[in-house]
Amino acid sequence: VCRDWFKETACRHAKSLGNCRTSQKYRANCAKTCELC
């Protein structure tokens, strides 16, 4: 679980879309975030 609620939400949202890498809105945090979640 991510410490940052926003990042955790972004991670879950990106995973739910099935494509973390191309999620432009969360692109900056997505790679690191998804590894933590």
Swiss-Prot record:
- Which residue positions hold the site described Important for binding Kv1.1, Kv1.2 and key residue for binding Kv1.3? 26
> What exactly does this protein do?
Inhibits voltage-dependent potassium channels of the Kv1 family (Kv1.1/KCNA1 (Kd=6 nM), Kv1.2/KCNA2 (Kd=15 nM), Kv1.3/KCNA3 (Kd=10-39 nM), Kv1.6/KCNA6, and KCa3.1/KCNN4 (Kd=172 nM)).
Q: Which residues are tagged with the site Key residue for binding Kv1.3?
A: 7
Q: Where is this site: Important for binding Kv1.2 and Kv1.3?
A: 13
What changing residue 29 to A does, per the record, is:
Shows distorsions in the dichroic spectrum. 5-20-fold decrease in affinity on Kv1.1 and on Kv1.3. Small decrease in affinity on Kv1.2
What organism is recorded for this protein? Bunodosoma granuliferum (Red warty sea anemone)
Task: Tell me what the record says results from residue 27 to A.
Answer: Small decrease in affinity on Kv1.1 and on Kv1.2. 5-20-fold decrease in affinity on Kv1.3
Q: What is its main location?
A: secreted
- Residues the record annotates as the site (Key residue for binding Kv1.2 and Kv1.3) are 6
Phenotype upon changing residue 21 to A: Small decrease in affinity on Kv1.1, Kv1.2 and Kv1.3
Where does it sit, as one GO cellular component term? nematocyst
Localisation per UniProt entry: Secreted; Nematocyst
Protein name, as recorded: Kappa-actitoxin-Bgr1a
UniProt effect for mutating residue 8 to A: No change in affinity on Kv1.1. Small increase in affinity on Kv1.2. Small decrease in affinity on Kv1.3
Question: Which residues does the UniProt site feature Key residue for binding Kv1.1 and Kv1.3 point to?
Answer: 19
